[in-house]
Amino acid sequence: MKLLDSVRYASFEPYLSIRTTHMAVIRYLVRDVDVAMEFYTNMLGFELVEKWGPPFAMVKRDDLTLWLSGPGSSAARPLTDGSKPAPGGWNRLVLETDSLVSLMERLSQSGAHFRSEVVSGPGGKQVLIDDPSGNPIELFEPSGR
């Protein structure tokens, strides 16, 4: 048991230097940083933190910082196996809302693409939308609101 514990702690050691003061950071690959910035700031309540030329911007909402990496950013470069990172997929960020219906109406009026109908469960109700580059966002209204 002692050897197993030392292996576990030894493998954790490199992670002790990870900065923990700001852990909620997500990077999304986007087709157009300006379009993505406008969507997240005007439609979902994020604020612009920084913009580094056309290929990169950071937006923030509460404790979440979202990195928007466009074509030409280092995150969009081909990987060593030749594959090229692209927007989309199913991993997603989840944004809580007090009124899913109101937010859906606003997004629908702006032409947002909904991936799903509203799904209800014991914890609340949710719907999936796409940002302008096809990255999924889950909008979630907890039960009891």
Language model segments and positions:
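Short glycine-/small-residue motifs
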Residues: 136-139
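Vicinal oxygen chelate
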Residues: 3-25, 47-96, 104-130, 141-145
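Conserved active-site tyrosine of GNAT-family acetyltransferases
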Residues: 36, 40-41, 107, 134
